[in-house]
UniProtKB/Swiss-Prot annotation:
PROSITE patterns from the UniProt entry: HEXAPEP_TRANSFERASES
Entry GO CC: membrane
Protein name, entry field: UDP-3-O-acylglucosamine N-acyltransferase
Functional note: Catalyzes the N-acylation of UDP-3-O-acylglucosamine using 3-hydroxyacyl-ACP as the acyl donor. Is involved in the biosynthesis of lipid A, a phosphorylated glycolipid that anchors the lipopolysaccharide to the outer membrane of the cell.
GO terms for biological process, alphabetical: lipid A biosynthetic process
EC primary class: transferase
The entry's keywords: Acyltransferase, Lipid A biosynthesis, Lipid biosynthesis, Lipid metabolism, Repeat, Transferase
GO molecular function: N-acyltransferase activity
Catalytic residues identified in the record: H245
Family according to the record: Belongs to the transferase hexapeptide repeat family. LpxD subfamily.
Reactions catalysed according to its record: a UDP-3-O-[(3R)-3-hydroxyacyl]-alpha-D-glucosamine + a (3R)-hydroxyacyl-[ACP] = a UDP-2-N,3-O-bis[(3R)-3-hydroxyacyl]-alpha-D-glucosamine + holo-[ACP] + H(+)
Length: 354
């Protein structure tokens, strides 16, 4: 089991030790569960009581944070980022064990790097490529002509369909499908004499996933009708997300669970969409846009804007509208009373109704 002194951890994350730098730590754990041999982290004031009561041997905190007397801490500008890096030290990513399981199916024309690991019942199709140190878990299917880069991890039952391209250091969580057919149909009122029908539009494009992307479990990224659906460098996509045909997701974007992005919409760099947000097709969403959970985006959004609600509006307007909801009943009563008063005054003055 790996262990590090507090000083060693500080050197790894660019932090400063307050307390015993020789303290040896053997793991990382939540504040409530950490023991004297483990390090934890504190970056959210909601957990102040847990921080003060914690039995952790040391805690990662940000500069200027008040700490209980005698507690060793590692001070660093971004405590959450430092936590992530320290956690990686104690729990390093799995490395490929260069082998192809006897029950894996590798087509003779496929090219699998000798350092890659292909587990039981994984399948690599004709002319497909799998890069160095990449791991294919059981049930993965890399289809005809698809390419998977170096240092990737494709978990159980991931599908990368024909001619799709996956970059380097990409993680695809279980059940993720890359390159499923886009939802494209043309209505045919005659149906070649057989009556009305929806005629399937061939989805002949592909999906390109750039480097350092992670795609969550059971997420679907549809292939383009023509051209490419693209997920930009460093984007992170949560579980159960739907990316439609020809969508362009900008670099470093974050799409939270159950987001849906309709066809041909373009998301700029660093867009963040909260859970269950829906974005209609053929829109332009600018760089750095923030979209609130359960929002329905139905128009282009300028770079840097934050929108909420359905239909989505600037977040400040949405907050005002939500604040008004609690008063609607009273306002309705007041309006009814005002109307009655106006009617009475008109009657007293002998005026007719307008």
């Amino acid at each position: 089991m790996a262990s590090y002194t507090l000083a060693e951890l500080a050197a790894r994350v660019g932090g400063q030790v307050d307390g015993d730098g020789k303290l040896r730590l053997e793991g990382i754990a939540p504040l409530e569960e950490a023991t004297a041999a483990e390090i934890s982290f504190f970056s959210n004031r909601k957990y102040r009581k847990a921080f003060e009561a914690s039995r952790a041997g040391a805690v990662v905190v940000e500069p200027g944070e008040k700490v209980p007397a005698g507690r060793p801490v590692l001070r660093v500008v971004n405590a959450y980022l430092a936590f992530a890096k320290i956690s990686t030290l104690f729990h390093p990513p799995r490395e490929a064990m260069p082998e192809v399981a006897p029950t894996a199916v590798i087509h003779p024309t496929a090219r699998v790097h000798p350092s890659a690991q292909v587990m039981p019942l994984a399948c690599v199709g004709p002319d497909a490529q799998v890069g160095a140190r990449t791991i294919l878990f059981p049930g993965v299917h890399v289809a005809d002509g698809a390419r998977v880069g170096e240092d990737c991890v494709l978990y159980h039952n991931v599908v990368v369909r024909e001619r799709c391209a996956v970059g380097n250091r990409v993680i695809l969580q279980p059940g993720c499908v890359v390159g499923s057919d886009g939802f494209g149909f043309a209505f045919d009122p005659d149906g070649e004499g057989k009556g009305p029908r929806h005629y399937k539009v061939p989805q002949v494009g592909n999906v390109v996933i750039e480097d350092d992307v992670e795609v969550g479990a059971n997420t679907c990224v549809d292939r383009a009708t023509l051209g490419s659906t693209r997920i930009g460098r460093g984007a992170k996509i949560d579980n159960l997300v739907q990316i439609a045909h020809n969508v362009q997701v900008g670099p470093l974007s974050l799409l939270v669970s159950q987001v849906g992005v309709a066809g041909s919409t373009k998301l700029g760099m660093g867009v963040v969409a909260g859970g269950q947000a829906g974005i209609v097709g053929h829109l332009e969403i600018g760089d750095g846009v923030r979209i609130g959970a359960q929002s329905g985006v139905m128009a282009d959004v300028e770079a840097g804007e934050t929108v909420s609600g359905s239909p989505a509006v600037p977040h400040g307007n949405w907050l005002k509208a939500m604040a008004s909801l609690d008063h609607l009943h009273d306002m309705r009563k007041e309006l009814r009373e005002l109307r009655r008063e106006v009617e009475r005054l008109r009657a007293d003055a002998g005026e007719d109704e307008p």
